Amino acid sequence: MGIHNNPLEQHVRLNAESCMFSRSFQIRHKHGQVDDKPYGGGPGMVMQAKPVLESIEQARDGNSEIPVFFLSPQGKRFNQEKAKELSELDQIIIVSSRYEGLDQRAIDQTDNHEEISIGDFVLSGGETACAVVIDAVARLIPGVLGDNESVIEESFSNGLLEYPHYTRPSEVNGQDVPGILLSGDHEKIKEWRKIQSLRNTFIKRPDLIDKSKLNDDEIKVIDDIKNDPE
């Protein structure tokens, strides 16, 4: 809702075998008004509840079991784990608001709903946030991306940041590609990438280390990194 089709088409180009279908719904009623001044005063306009509720009803098409996700800075943080959860659902409805926000009654009167947030910052409208959620979810659906292995190895797929990437040429301004990547030894490369993933996460996002379920070998690597962060 409230998002044009073009951004959806540009974020993930679906191949012919993909089973994803997205559709936007018009929330404006026949007079074209969907917002009004807030009760109690204050700046800006508030999206009215009734047009939103009617659009949700239209999108559900009689199936009240379809979950509705309201994009809101008050919602639970959207992350890779949540994206994976949404990608496994047959259908979802995403509601993005504009102006100062959405009449609370639209949320209160919607069964089977959840509020989600893409971060602690403010956007001019929810369309961008909606596109972010759709892109993160769609690429996890089998067949959407050409290489499913790339999804498995990406940052956050296992709760950690990804390892650094390199490509040709092997030297740029005096900086060489790590020699291990040129060795052809796939087991050693895999081990190096695992260590670099742990190092990246520990240095850049230590909060993720606390949330990750590390095995004994990974914990030892973290201990080594603590003793020698370079």
PLM segments and residue spans:
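Glycine-rich, flexible N-terminal cofactor/catalytic loop recognition
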Residues: M1-S24
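Conserved beta-strand scaffold positions in the cores of enzyme catalytic domains, especially
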Residues: S18-F21, V68-F70, E115-S117
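Short, surface-exposed acidic-centric catalytic microdomains
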Residues: F21-G40
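Short, structured active-site "lid" loops
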Residues: V34-I56
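S-adenosyl-L-methionine/SAH cofactor-binding core of RNA-modifying enzymes
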Residues: Q48-R98, L102-Q104
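Structured adenosyl-cofactor binding patch, chiefly the S-adenosyl-L-methionine
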Residues: A106-E154
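Internal, active-site/partner-interface "lid" segment
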Residues: T128, L140-I180
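SAM-dependent methyltransferases
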Residues: S170-E230
